[in-house]
């Protein structure tokens, strides 16, 4: 959607078109290419696809698939255009693993003028009417909050840059800051669009688990269409792929059914227990390698062939993390996985327990190498509202009142749908982006360093920025030697005197973060 298309009046007519799946680009003869790659393993030269016979496709293809030699199917890549898919499906399934690439329409920058939302297969006219009423209320509240918050956004901008905002074009640009906060009330059913690229092997995997809870009905449609598009391009590509695991045989479904016979899940008690473990944090460091820095130093010495007498731990760590010594750190391109010395950052390891909004985790999960165990939401449904309130909402009394009243209202809609017999996986589509999620996330220091660098920038949305600051502070308290130079791009680049300090151009936040001694919540204006 262009900026011009996203700036008109809000339309309260609900549009719920079917998912649109288009295969945009793909390898020519992808299955033949996979077999040629397999043959190359046993050849002194590279085998061309033109040399592949029908017998080889059946014999080698079957042998590779049945024998678990699946990397040959990873060479073939498919790029899809996906439209009219729900954000719940994207979060729950499409982006729940690390092996993909997406460029997705952003609710932070694209105003949602039209009510475009997924409608699950809800039975009964009255139930469907109630569902659509809930969706409509989401958009009405979104529009209301956008208008209320715009004044705050403009005021803060004027204070930061010490000048009045009078230009309509600039006001329109600033309105995006208002909608990125207001989007917390939009439903999980809200449509999104994207370019989504994945390998043939990943498509095989998604096909296998297509019935996984909780968005299985939408998965069958979207993944089914993706598979049909590939089959049309190359009928051979799914020659040996087995049927998906039935819903009743999936481990999550079987576990839930067996648990019901013992003691039903109690989401309220679970949430209370989890939150008590967090204490004052929203992202709490719960586990780490005590000797992480020492392991990193050992790895540096092993890489460079040095003894401990030649290089102590502090100097070894500093050789990697000091931007004045490591030019790679001053670049926006992350090369830590291909730099021999920077691979030493892989050895320290950290685990966090986190409570965050669905909106925030949809950003958080895009850091695919910081892996997390995320909730199957249907097992954690609560009758009482359970949501995150953005900082910008809390400081505006009018917005806060509208926000809290809406949360009570939307949970009532969801509860009424459940009372009417609507399955929980369908009813939860009306829940807002603000719904609280609780998860366990872990990663090595290298991947966290990259994530923290991006999300500690003040251009990052406030919620994920605050979680990032909490994580960095806790690791700094335990291991100061690992955090001596950490921060957003501007903080890292100034330590090497690389200009410009800020890499965001005209998106600069307006605050000289590189001059701050530390990142503090109260220092951030927006």
Report each predicted region and the residues it spans.
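A conserved ligand/cofactor-binding region detector
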Residues: 1-526
